[in-house]
Amino acid sequence: MLFPEDQVAFCERCFHSTPCWCCHLPCGPLHRRLSDERIVCQHCYSTALLSPSQLGPLYEGTIRFFQNQMKMRLKNRPRLKVTDQRYLLREFEITDHTFGLYTNSLEEETIFIITGIAEDRAWITLAHELTHFWQKRNCPNPQALVLVEGFAEWTVYKLAEHHGLERAMLSMRRNVAEPYHTELHALLGLEQKLGVQGVVHLARTKAGLN
């Protein structure tokens, strides 16, 4: 059984094995069960980030990307907290496949990241949630949800492009979930006409694309 776009192949037995929670490909006979019962494949586990000290350099790298490549300045930053899925399910009633979450309370703002996700997934999760932090300070309120989420996904795509995360870019292009899919492709099209800073300016000034 072939997954040509992912450049991997599986025998029939492995093809029908448990899918990896992180990449969704079959785990095969080798897999790891995390503390909160999620099952991940050996490939994802080999780059899994399990502690704040491992995620810290990626967080700093994401902030540098925002400021240097995207010109999206951050005067301050939210707290970064690594937790397991059970905590987010209990405290925030997230969906089963949420990799991260940005929360805004009167006391503090926090980006939660699920422990045990692969490095490329951690990059894009950090970028998506950090975009929401930036949007709160720089974009119209209210702003259409499709533009809020579409711009966050577009920013993630630019980070993946910058770091050469080809599989992440492919996954985003073929993701049909809304409100991410349509607006991501719309903003990629607008980028060809307006450039990167033109899209950032649109997000800063418009309540929606219509």
Regions found by a protein language model. Give the residues of each.
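Short pre-active-site segment immediately N-terminal to the catalytic Zn-binding motif
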Residues: L106-L126, C139-A144
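Post-HExxH zinc-binding segment in Zn-dependent metallohydrolases
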Residues: N138-H181
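Auxiliary, metal-adjacent structural segments of Zn-dependent hydrolase domains
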Residues: L49-E109
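Preference for well-ordered, secondary-structure-rich cores of eukaryotic proteins
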Residues: I113, Q135, L194-G195
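Active-site recognition of the HExxH zinc-binding catalytic motif
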Residues: F66, I124-R137, E149-E153
